Amino acid sequence: MGDWSFLGEFLEEVHKHSTVIGKVWLTVLFIFRMLVLGTAAESSWGDEQADFQCDTMQPGCGNVCYDQAFPISHIRYWVLQIIFVSTPSLVYMGHAMHTVRMQEKRKLREAERAKEARGAGSYEYPVAEKAELSCWEEVNGRIVLQGTLLNTYVCSILIRTTMEVAFIVGQYLLYGIFLDTLHVCRRSPCPHPVNCYVSRPTEKNVFIVFMLAVAALSLFLSLAELYHLGWKKLRQRFVKSGQGMAECQLPGPSAGIVQNCTPPPDFNQCLENGPGGKFFNPFSNKMASQQNTDNLATEQVQGQEPIPGEGFIHIRYAQKPEVPNGASPGHRLPHGYQSDKRRLSKASSKARSDDLSV
């Protein structure tokens, strides 16, 4: 059937730069398709036309009936299927090898320029340049595709998936699923319907079902690989978008600074600084006691007659020592009233205790 070594060497290179599912697909292609097709299936269809017997002596009728029964041999059809399905992978391999060569040349040029700039010595590429130049990375021993190489790889999977579906549908339309033992031919130049018999139909049916199952498995692996690459790409985008949103929600350096608000004009009348820098309620027992004392003195003064020649009473308050918040001093007249030396009793018609003590 030919030498498969050339195709095998190329597919081995593809195997090095593929994902895990892609490596499984290549294993299925090597073992279950190329190996089985080259060893067992070819021997079953080797005597296909010679053992195709028809019950007629009409010249040319047997060839016409064989062409009607088998428009293309199963072996040749499967060989074409393998070639067309493997071609996208070969294109991807060519692109990968070209990319590797270009990267090596670029690194050599950069190294030569660095040596010329520094005079001598080895040059090591920074990590950023390596990531920028390479089209894949090795993470934990696995190759992570990225960039244009990833796009080429996805396109190769799409093309081989389309080819796989086309060849499966074509085989079903040409032959169906199983071969019949008896084939009735009604083509010219056969004078009447001619019965033709297929050799070893059961063995051929086994190989046909096996190759269809392998094709379905390869199609499933291709779809699984597309799903794997697409899901991983979407997950990376979601992770990047989540990180971007988290960075946007982080407070800036000036967000934690609390701005001091300007208090209202009468704020100091409501709050006073107590001992230790704490605020306490100004309406304490001290303030209440002082207010009661003032009210009592005012009532006593208002109960007396006014002094002639004076329109109002002059009241003088003296500073009192601070009384603790919990203590309430007794009700007594302020010092201003006790030390007042004016003779209010002479101007009043009422008798007072001061008038009797001369």
UniProtKB/Swiss-Prot annotation:
Listed SUPFAM superfamilies: Connexin43 (SSF118220)
This protein's encoding gene: GJA5
Membrane topology: Multi-pass membrane protein
Location(s) in or outside the cell: Cell membrane; Cell junction, Gap junction
One GO term (biological process): cell-cell signaling
Subunit details: A connexon is composed of a hexamer of connexins.
InterPro entries reported for this sequence: Connexin, Connexin40, Connexin_C, Connexin_CCC, Connexin_CS, Connexin_N, Connexin_N_sf, Cx40_C
Function, as annotated: One gap junction consists of a cluster of closely packed pairs of transmembrane channels, the connexons, through which materials of low MW diffuse from one cell to a neighboring cell.
Cytoplasmic side: 1-19, 98-164, 227-358
Major localisation: membrane
Transmembrane regions listed in the UniProt entry: 20-40, 77-97, 165-185, 206-226
Region: Disordered, residue numbers: 318-358
PROSITE patterns with a match to the protein in the record: CONNEXINS_1, CONNEXINS_2
Full protein name: Gap junction alpha-5 protein
Topological domains annotated Extracellular: 41-76, 186-205
Chain positions found as Phosphoserine: 353, 357
Organism of this sequence: Canis lupus familiaris
Keywords tagged on the record: Cell junction, Cell membrane, Gap junction, Membrane, Phosphoprotein, Transmembrane, Transmembrane helix
Family: Belongs to the connexin family. Alpha-type (group II) subfamily.
